[in-house]
Amino acid sequence: METSTISFSSSSPPSPPPPQPAPGDIDAVSLGRLSRNLENLLDPAFLNCADAEIVLASGGGDPGGGAVVGVHRCILAARSRFFYDHFSSAPAPAPATAGDKPQLDLDGLVPGGRHIGRDALVAVLSYLYTGRLRSAPPEAAACLDDGCSHDACRPAIDFVVESTYAASGFQISELVSLFQRRLSDFVNKALAEDILPILVVASTCHLPELLNQCIQRVANSNLDNRYLEKRLPDDLYAKLKEFRVPDEPHSGILDPEHEKRVRNIHKALDSDDVDLVGMLLKESPVTLDDAFAIHYAAAYCEPKVLAELLKLESANVNLKNSSGYTPLHMACMRREPDIIVSLIEKGASVLERTQDGRDALTICKRLTREKDRNEKSEKCKERSKAYLCIGVLQQEIKRRPQILEDQMSAEESIATPLLVDNFHMRLLNLENRVAFARIFFPSEAKLVMRIAQADSTQEFAGLTSANFSKLKEVDLNETPTMQNRRLRERLDALTKTVELGRRYFPHCSEVLDKFLNEESTDLILLESGTAEDQQTKRMRFSELREDVRKAFTKDKAAGAAISSSTSASSSPRYETKLRPGNKKGKLSR
């Protein structure tokens, strides 16, 4: 019998070999791997094979250590002409110290070297090692304020300023151009006092365009001349004064004789001579407040000098200078906990705000890096001054919680200008809330507005956009003090209206909160999106409208017993609640 043999073979062609990367892709992968490998050399956790060390001034801004960065001379010399020239001209080490690593003092190595911190130095060195500029570490370039976007806060500025000093000193032109553009963006966004480090680095590193931009911005700010004189080198301050208008408020000069007496007091404080300050006060009509002596001591003097100064005479520790800062604000900019405690003990308010809405705690947080928080410090170890300042301010705020929410209306002075965006935003938010309350709960709204005396103020009479636009209108017959008083009274009345509404009509207030927080309640949004989205939004709007109706019925029933006991009137149950002999237990839950 013949046996047939059947062979099985695939009719499909063999699978093609995997595609080979193009030569350019291979180069990119290899260079990327090389960059990562070289970057490991700057990692303290990696094998320490450095043959030289760069010594930072004062620990490079890192308390408790990190004052030395190990480097490799061969890499730096190959990548940087600056380091090639430096290492080739450096004398050979002495035989007795041949085994030691040569050290480069950063303060004497480059202009502005004493300002460079470890994080900025490592970032610039990493560019020399890898050819890539890595992003700034968040813990070094972000502040502690959760409400800050960190695009122009002080830690972000300081990191780029320090990096500019390093890049300019090491003659890395492409990095200098990049950092200059970033600093230019900061000038347009940052606070005036935070621009001063940029002004100094622009002068030191010979960046004329950036320097002129900084001078124009600072010259037009409300920073007083004494502050600038203390913070800037003499040549920069002299150049800046040329651009300032002499009769502006920031000049602080009333007359030559007054200016002379004030300067004598400040010179005595510079010499720590509080006794001389006392003599000068007795010999002239100038007071501590006139000379802003508490501000000066809080910003520039030793803590003991301020403590002695506060004993001389009664001074207003909450007085604001021409820039809108209290002595506590100045102390927070300095982050000196002893001075902060001394001022608080004398009655300084932690809730006073600057013209742009910052309080003392916010000032401290926006000056403090995340890495400076130092919350996990070991026992028996000193904590950073920044951490102590924040802790003191937080405890003081907790001690007075009843005035935290109503800070703006609790301020005693009405002379400080209030026409700033955050103030108007708060006022507009309150007006919007009261306007919706009058639409949804007209009777309840009228009652609480009468109690809060809000309906007696002309500004609250209408609900049109024309009335809201009056917020920023200028009445030529109205002085700034009158305008500020009117705005404060308006804010107080609206705040009181909302508080009374929450107390006596909690269900209505709860639904109003829900209504204002729901994006779908915007009538414009009801018609946006797909058909399915519009249907969902309409359903949600109907649900909220039903909640409004139920809440109205519930609060109305709660006050029915009181209403029935009153005589007939246009609004009987409201008038009953105002009479002292009636019970209110059911309405104040």
From Swiss-Prot:
Region Disordered, as annotated, extends over: 1-25, 555-589
Name the residues that bind Zn(2+).
Answer: C143, C148, H150, C153
Keyword Repeat among record annotations: yes
UniProt GO molecular function: zinc ion binding
Q: Where is the composition biased (Basic residues)?
A: 580-589
Q: Where is the composition biased (Pro residues)?
A: 13-22
Q: Looking at the UniProt record for this protein, which Gene Ontology cellular component terms does it annotate, in alphabetical order?
A: nucleus
Q: List zinc finger spans: C2HC NPR-type.
A: 140-154
InterPro entries attached to this UniProt entry: Ankyrin_rpt, Ankyrin_rpt-contain_sf, BTB/POZ_dom, NPR, NPR1/NIM1-like_C, NPR_central_dom, SKP1/BTB/POZ_sf
Q: What is its main location?
A: nucleus
Its pathway?
Protein modification; protein ubiquitination
Per the UniProt record, one Pfam family is DUF3420
Q: According to the UniProt entry, which residue ranges have a biased composition of type Low complexity?
A: 558-571
Q: Present the record's domain note.
A: The BTB/POZ domain mediates the interaction with some component of ubiquitin ligase complexes.
Q: What does this protein do?
A: Salicylic acid (SA)-binding substrate-specific adapter of an E3 ubiquitin-protein ligase complex (CUL3-RBX1-BTB) which mediates the ubiquitination and subsequent proteasomal degradation of target proteins. Involved in defense response against the bacterial blight disease caused by Xanthomonas oryzae pv. oryzae (Xoo). Plants expressing an NPR3/NH3 transgene driven by its native promoter show enhanced resistance to the Xoo pathogen, and exhibit elevated sensitivity to benzothiadiazole (BTH) treatment and enhanced induction of defense-related genes upon treatment with BTH.
Q: How does it assemble?
A: Interacts with TGA2.1, TGA2.2, TGA2.3, LG2, TGAL1, TGAL4, NRR, RH1, RH2 and RH3.
Instruction: Give the protein name, as stated in the record.
Output: BTB/POZ domain and ankyrin repeat-containing protein NPR3
Organism equals: Oryza sativa subsp. japonica
